[in-house]
């Protein structure tokens, strides 16, 4: 979660173990640990988020959040595929939301995999240039 939070290609990280989480203080008082599931928003759209997930090699893509293997899902396409973007937004599900259940793999390997997958997607500056070019 800390690695993702510092990345410019991640807009937001949802994990109660982070000091930046709005309920971190409550979680610290009530929990003995913060769990192995982290959700985050990729800085991009539905397609960019899918590209990020496709570039990962460690986690399996799937809706389950419990097991020894790392599992990841693009929430809009796996859990809310039958809803339109507008319907998903109405319940707070953005197209760039990712849910990642961390397994027993080596943490350094997981971070390296996240790093290479993030490196493979365009940054905000490049996306802004593309958008400006298409508007002209």
Regions found by a protein language model. Name each.
Residues 1, 50, 85:
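Short glycine-/small-residue-rich flexible loop motifs, especially phosphate/cofactor-binding loops
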Residues 1-13:
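Short acidic amphipathic segments
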Residues 8-10, 34-35, 94-96:
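Short coil/turn connectors at secondary-structure junctions
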Residues 9-12, 64, 112, 126:
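Short linear functional motifs in flexible/disordered or boundary regions
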Residues 54, 70-136:
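PLP-dependent enzyme catalytic core of the Aspartate aminotransferase-like
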């Amino acid at each position: 979660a800390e690695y993702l939070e510092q990345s410019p290609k991640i807009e937001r990280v949802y994990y109660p173990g982070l000091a930046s989480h709005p309920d971190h203080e409550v979680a610290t008082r009530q929990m003995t640990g913060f769990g192995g599931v982290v959700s985050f928003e990729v800085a991009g759209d539905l397609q960019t988020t899918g590209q990020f997930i496709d570039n990962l090699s460690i986690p399996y893509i799937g809706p389950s959040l419990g097991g020894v293997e790392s599992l990841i899902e693009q929430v809009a396409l796996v859990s809310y595929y039958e809803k339109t973007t507008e319907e998903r937004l109405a319940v707070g599900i953005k197209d760039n939301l990712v849910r990642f259940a961390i397994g027993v793999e080596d943490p350094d390997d997981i971070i390296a995999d996240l790093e290479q997958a993030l490196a493979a997607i365009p940054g905000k500056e490049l996306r802004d240039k593309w958008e400006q070019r298409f508007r002209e």
